[in-house]
Amino acid sequence: MITKILLPHDGTEMSKRAVDKAKEFAKAFNGEILLLYVIEDIPIPATLILGNERTWISQTKRSIAKKLEEGWMKMAQEKIISNLANENIKAAAKVLIGSDSSPAEQIVKFAKDNQIDMIIMGSRRLEHISSKIKALGSVARRVSEAAECPVLIVH
């Protein structure tokens, strides 16, 4: 039974389509949707990390991540979770901030740690190759290869 659906969301059109597909599954199985946004760590060149700048850079990175988190949570609540609630679908949102692991690894670990039954995510079309080619982005591919639960990738 599919009762816990993880929906990694990055704001792209493909992620918006994935919301619609997750909604179908949640309705069919009386499931809940957990939106997940991963904020990647911001790499800083070693040449910039000198003396007192290290503290300032760390504080600035935390400040940027916090603003991204607040903005995404506001968007998730106003545009996604409230719409799902209007359709009687239970939903929540979570943000993961900067880690040594990749976004795909964080998604897979989160799914395992939270006993997710299914992951539904957008494919992230590779625009620079051709607008006619629908290809998997690296995060979707890696999640589909590593996840222990079923993964539905939406084009």
Language-model segments: residues:
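Small/aliphatic-rich secondary-structure junction motif
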Residues: 1-62, 89, 146
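Gly/Ser-rich helix-loop-strand patches that form or flank binding pockets
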Residues: 111-155
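Histidine-centered beta-alpha loop that forms part of the nucleotide-sugar donor binding/catalytic region
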Residues: 10, 96, 123-126
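Generic structural signal for helix capping and beta-alpha/helix-loop junctions
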Residues: 42-43, 101, 128
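Alpha-helix-centered segments that form part of catalytic cores
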Residues: 67-78, 82
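Active-site phosphate/pyrophosphate- and oxyanion-stabilizing loops and adjacent acidic/basic residues
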Residues: 23, 108, 141
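General small-molecule cofactor/ligand-binding pocket signal
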Residues: 36, 92-96, 152
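Structural beta-alpha unit
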Residues: 78, 82-119
